[in-house]
Amino acid sequence: MRKNLHYLFPVLAVLLFVGCNTGDKSQQAMDNNENVSQQMSPVTIDDSTVNGLVVYYPEFSCIDLVCEKMPSQEDTNIVFCAEAAFTHELLDEFAHSNIDGDHVSGGKRYTGAKCKDNSGAFAWFSDSTWEFVNGEYSELLDSVAAAGGMGFGQAIIIHDGESIQPLWREGVNQYRALCEKDGRLCIVDSRDEVSYEQFVEMLEAFGPRHALYMDMGAGWNHSWWRDSDGKVHEIHPIAEKSRYCTNWITFYK
């Protein structure tokens, strides 16, 4: 279901919820997030929401799927960007065919690699509406390309309030999902390293209408957002595999 955007938020409001300490690495991430929250003005904290999640609400007028090169932090029109679809192989040269699943960037549809884990998709239309799909999404991509928007496939976690859970990842990680919550788009991260099952349970408690998996892991999780003073904050540092990233969901003010 598409939703009209009729909301005026801060340039980027961040909801920070304190989770369990699972080690020095997680404690450092927690301290960094708390320092960021002190720098932001204003900061929205929802004590009624599940502990262990960090929720980013960007204020935006446009979304695109930027491919090949990560958006520059010097572009002050950007308020948030993060890796979206999976990258198929670790290649030194970029190719749209190395992005898992067909996708739409800048209003143009591209053929991507086949990916059995892509059980759904997200699309944003140039009339400021969006749609989450569970299942086949080729028709959606045709529509959003014709409308000059963007879209990509990923693993759907929650659709219309019901858990789909198609992708059970092994081990622990800091996970991320693109969500619709109370008619607003947001990016939801686990504050600490957790199992995928725990992340899904936290998302269920958070209660989004839709949740779509986003690529994470060391290097893939490098992302950033801009505060109301124009300062850029990196959520995760650049790592070895960052150079293989291929696509980023990018929110513009």
Question: Could you describe each region identified by the protein language model?
Answer:
Residues 16-19:
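C-terminal motif of bacterial Sec signal peptides marking the signal peptidase cleavage site
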Residues 91-162:
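Active-site-adjacent helix-turn-beta-strand microarchitecture at beta-sheet edges
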Residues 94-113, 169, 180, 184-193, ...:
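Conserved, well-ordered active-site substructure
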Residues 148-188:
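Flexible, glycine-rich surface segments
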Residues 1-9:
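Bacterial N-terminal signal peptides that target proteins for export
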Residues 118-120, 172-177, 245-246:
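Short glycine-rich loop/turn motifs
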Residues 21-114, 188-189:
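Zymogen propeptides
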